[in-house]
């Protein structure tokens, strides 16, 4: 039986205030919109608690988590149900004030990955410069030029489509994505939800992770057969080649 995922990304909301040219939000709309129902989030927490999940959990897919009205509730529930997990927030920083950072830290967030995206002046720069040492240590502050851009599974035409068809990918061996409506995806590149593996409202996430569809997909990607999947055949992302847990890839 395959080992359990060490990372889980939860789409607590679908909205983003930016439409960066290197993000699918600039060319398409998510199939699922809105915010996750707190009852569904609780279901996920109960399932992860039963697994004693101790990996990385983050609160995004292609949305900006600080726009989620229930973010504080979700972070608090995470700390309550899975205290050994590592809660991390990935954000564009536009709504991250010093007070907000401190509140979320008190609720359990261990790290903030803030990316200064292309476009409008970044408000967070001034906040970051004024942070005390202990708070600043919780922030990884990146410029968009630091990022290794992918074509998001072939969605973005403005990023080279050159396929890495024979290269392995360990993303579905390490990570699960849970969408606003509870659908489980095998990859953070699956913006259009081509590979739904199950739904946490209908099955335990462990059962979904170990089902035949997910297991076969993992094996295929480990062996480098990207060309057999519509999701992967045009993907140029080769950043995840090991089963090690990571916070971000440069």
Curated annotation (Swiss-Prot):
Signal peptide: none annotated. Changing residue 20 to A: Reduced iron-sulfur content by 50%. GO terms for molecular function: 4 iron, 4 sulfur cluster binding; metal ion binding; oxidoreductase activity. Its EC number is 1.1.99.38. The keyword Iron applies. Belongs to the radical SAM superfamily. Catalyzes the radical S-adenosyl-L-methionine (SAM)-dependent two-electron oxidation of 2-deoxy-scyllo-inosamine (DOIA) to amino-dideoxy-scyllo-inosose (amino-DOI) in the biosynthetic pathway of butirosin. This is S-adenosyl-L-methionine-dependent 2-deoxy-scyllo-inosamine dehydrogenase.
């Amino acid at each position: 039986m395959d080992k359990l995922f060490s990372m889980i990304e939860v789409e607590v909301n679908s909205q983003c205030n930016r439409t960066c040219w290197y993000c699918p939000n600039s060319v398409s709309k998510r199939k699922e919109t809105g915010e996750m129902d707190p009852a569904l989030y609780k279901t996920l927490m109960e399932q992860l608690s039963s697994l004693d999940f101790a990996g990385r959990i983050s609160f995004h897919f292609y949305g900006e988590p600080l726009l989620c009205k229930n973010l504080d509730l979700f972070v608090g529930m995470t700390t309550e149900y899975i205290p050994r997990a590592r809660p991390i927030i990935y954000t564009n920083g536009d709504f991250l004030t010093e007070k907000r950072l401190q509140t979320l830290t008190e609720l359990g967030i261990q790290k903030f990955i803030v990316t200064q995206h292309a476009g409008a002046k970044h408000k967070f720069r001034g906040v970051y410069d004024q942070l005390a040492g202990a708070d600043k240590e919780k922030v990884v502050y990146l410029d968009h030029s630091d990022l290794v851009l992918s074509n998001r599974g072939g969605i973005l035409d403005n990023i080279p489509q050159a396929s890495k068809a024979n290269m392995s990918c360990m993303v579905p061996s390490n990570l699960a994505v849970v969408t606003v409506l509870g659908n489980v995806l095998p990859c953070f590149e699956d913006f259009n939800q081509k590979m739904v593996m199950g739904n946490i409202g209908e099955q335990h996430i462990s059962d979904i992770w170990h089902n035949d569809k997910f297991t076969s997909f993992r094996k295929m990607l480990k062996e480098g057969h990207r060309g057999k999947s519509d999701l992967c055949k045009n993907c140029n992302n080769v950043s995840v080649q090991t089963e090690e847990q990571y916070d971000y890839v440069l």
